[in-house]
Amino acid sequence: MKFGIEFVPSDPALKIAYYAKLSEQQGFDYVWITDHYNNRDVYSTLTVLALNTNSIKIGSGVTNSYTRNPAITASSIASIAEISGGRAVLGLGPGDKATFDAMGIAWEKPLATTKEAIQAIRDFIAGKKVSMDGEMVKFAGAKLAFKAGNVPIYMGAQGPKMLELAGEVADGVLINASHPKDFEVAVEQIRKGAEKVGRDPSEVDVTAYACFSIDKDPAKAINAAKVVVAFIVAGSPDLVLERHGIPVDAKKQIGDAIAKGDFGALMGGLVTPQMIEAFAICGTPEDCMKRIKDLEAIGVTQIVAGSPIGPEKEKAIKLIGKEIIAKM
């Protein structure tokens, strides 16, 4: 089992670099930095991380092919690969409609866009001249002036078609989920995609990009996870809620509370223990270890400790290192 950790660049880059270095010292294998227009730039942040770490792999978790042209993405991640001495990974997904609506960007044909972007980015990174007349991605002899070496590409994927595509074309897949029920479905879709193109499914790094909250006091861990879980519930398809026995109307209640900024209601009872169980790896080190082993048995090969990580970030990073990574 590999271990990654997610940081959101709402914090200054040097603060994230401190946490990234600490994560490296605690045995984490990957640091993933989110990419949203309202936060600090992902590639600027990754540059700072590259210069302040030695061995941990660093990547976008995840960018998309709408806000940045694939040639620009290829140039950016190739630069990170060069600066970091070959430690860069690219996390790329379809993005989300709400963000693109706010930016005035049309979210068209995400499956075709993602597939074609990955093909183009691989060719750019390999130093090839790219000519492509795809459904959504088009180039006419564009080429980078330098080669990056090998940069693994991980797809952010949730739905069955995206998961199947990840099995076909990606080195890994980042799945926003944390429960075995969700991964039983996801692993099958990835396997289907891999076998469709004659790949060994074990070549794909199946990653649980999870809401993670750890503390020796389980109540503190649960409270820290509630707001993140609320956003997950509010954005979950009905099918996923039904899979976990969560009433579909809870999505509207929680969505309304988020829209009103009524976080007291979320902390007070709208986010139930059932929701925490379904959408977070949460609790004591022993609780978290049990869930991780359950996921490993299904076929998950990397765990990413995503927001909030724990009620106290530095303490949580050390706890994961000493009580989980060191014992796996």
From Swiss-Prot:
Q: What does this protein do?
A: Catalyzes the reversible reduction of methylene-H(4)MPT to methyl-H(4)MPT.
Q: Which reaction does it catalyse?
A: 5-methyl-5,6,7,8-tetrahydromethanopterin + oxidized coenzyme F420-(gamma-L-Glu)(n) + H(+) = 5,10-methylenetetrahydromethanopterin + reduced coenzyme F420-(gamma-L-Glu)(n)
**What protein family is recorded?**
Belongs to the mer family.
Organism name: Methanosarcina acetivorans (strain ATCC 35395 / DSM 2834 / JCM 12185 / C2A)
What Gene3D superfamilies does the record tag this protein with? Luciferase-like domain (3.20.20.30)
Q: In which pathway does it act?
A: One-carbon metabolism; methanogenesis from CO(2); methyl-coenzyme M from 5,10-methylene-5,6,7,8-tetrahydromethanopterin: step 1/2
Any one GO MF term held by the record is:
coenzyme F420-dependent N5,N10-methenyltetrahydromethanopterin reductase activity
* Gene giving rise to this polypeptide: mer
One Gene Ontology term of the biological-process aspect is:
methanogenesis, from carbon dioxide
Which EC number(s) are documented for this chain? 1.5.98.2
Q: PANTHER family under this entry? A: 5,10-METHYLENETETRAHYDROMETHANOPTERIN REDUCTASE, PTHR43244
Keywords, alphabetical: Cytoplasm, Methanogenesis, One-carbon metabolism, Oxidoreductase
Q: State the disulfide connectivity.
A: none
Domain of life assignment: Archaea
Q: Name one GO cellular component term.
A: cytoplasm
Where it sits in the cell: the answer is: Cytoplasm
The main location is cytoplasm
Q: What protein does this entry describe?
A: 5,10-methylenetetrahydromethanopterin reductase
